[in-house]
Amino acid sequence: MKTIIFKDFQFEAAHYLPYVPKMHKCRRLHGHSFFVRLELKDKINEKNGWIIDYAEIKLAFQPIYDQLDHHFLNDIPGLENPTSEILAKWIWHRLKPKLSILNTIIIKETCTSGCIYQGF
């Protein structure tokens, strides 16, 4: 039986979406308090009783966080069109090699809108 654990992060960043219609509100420069949830799935280690130390998750995500927090996302290579979907995929490809049991990334731009990415 496998268990899913999660660690949440939040970062502030500005962006705009260059490929939406000119009059669309997301075409203008704006910012968000982005919410990121990393979900990891594995068997519970019988010896220590956990899947992974939460500190290891934070350590693996820290360089990505530093690249995103208080930055203009469109200037980051690979995020020229920084939709929630593309951002989730971008994070996945940087984090999965460090956290092989990464199962899901959830991105929320607002409290009502977001993306769930499972990196198949």
From Swiss-Prot:
Disulfide bonds: none annotated. Its EC number is 4.1.2.50. InterPro entries: 6-PTP_synth/QueD, 6-PTP_synth/QueD_sf. SUPFAM superfamilies: Tetrahydrobiopterin biosynthesis enzymes-like. Binds 1 zinc ion per subunit. Keywords: Lyase, Metal-binding, Queuosine biosynthesis, Zinc. GO terms for molecular function: 6-carboxytetrahydropterin synthase activity; metal ion binding. Catalyzes the conversion of 7,8-dihydroneopterin triphosphate (H2NTP) to 6-carboxy-5,6,7,8-tetrahydropterin (CPH4) and acetaldehyde. Belongs to the PTPS family. QueD subfamily. PANTHER family: 6-PYRUVOYL TETRAHYDROBIOPTERIN SYNTHASE, PYRUVOYL TETRAHYDROBIOPTERIN SYNTHASE. This is 6-carboxy-5,6,7,8-tetrahydropterin synthase. It comes from Buchnera aphidicola subsp. Schizaphis graminum (strain Sg).
